[in-house]
Amino acid sequence: MARADNRDRLARELVPKPAKDVGLNPNNIRVVQEGLYDATHASYGTSAGIFGSFPIPIVGKTGTAEKYVTLPNYQGLQDQAWWCGYGPYDKPSLVVCAMIENGGHGGVVAAPVALQVFQKFFGVDPSSYSAAVTNSD
C-alpha cells in the first residue's frame, strides 16, 4: 500500500497494521454492512444511482451536515455534503470519504467525487457502464 501526492507520484510506502478486535457482535456488523449495501444498490438507496451499476460492489452512506451560522458574512452558505464507503463489498481494499464544504447534499455532490476515486483506483472506464445521478439524501 502506498500514498501518492497530487501528481500520482509515490509519497511514501504504507504498512497496514492489523485491526484490533473491539468486541462488536458479528450480527450487528452484518446488519450495518447490509444497510451500507442497500444505500448503494437498493432502489431506495441514497447513492444507488451513482454506485448501483458500478462493476465492483461498492457500499457506503451519504450525508448532509447541517450548518447553523448567525454571522452575517456566513449567511447563505450551503450544508456540508459527505459520502463514506468502501469496496469491494466482500473483500474491501479501499475506503473513501469525500467531504465537500458548502456542497449541499452528499448523494448529489460527494458521492460522484467518491465514485471518481473508485474508478481511478480500480481502473474502471466511466464509459464502460451507465450510472444515473441521484438527487436526494
Q: Which residue stretches match the model-derived regions?
A:
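Active-site beta-strand/loop architecture of penicillin-binding DD-peptidases
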Residues: 1-20, 27, 36-128
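Short, highly charged C-terminal tails/helix-capping segments
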Residues: 129-137
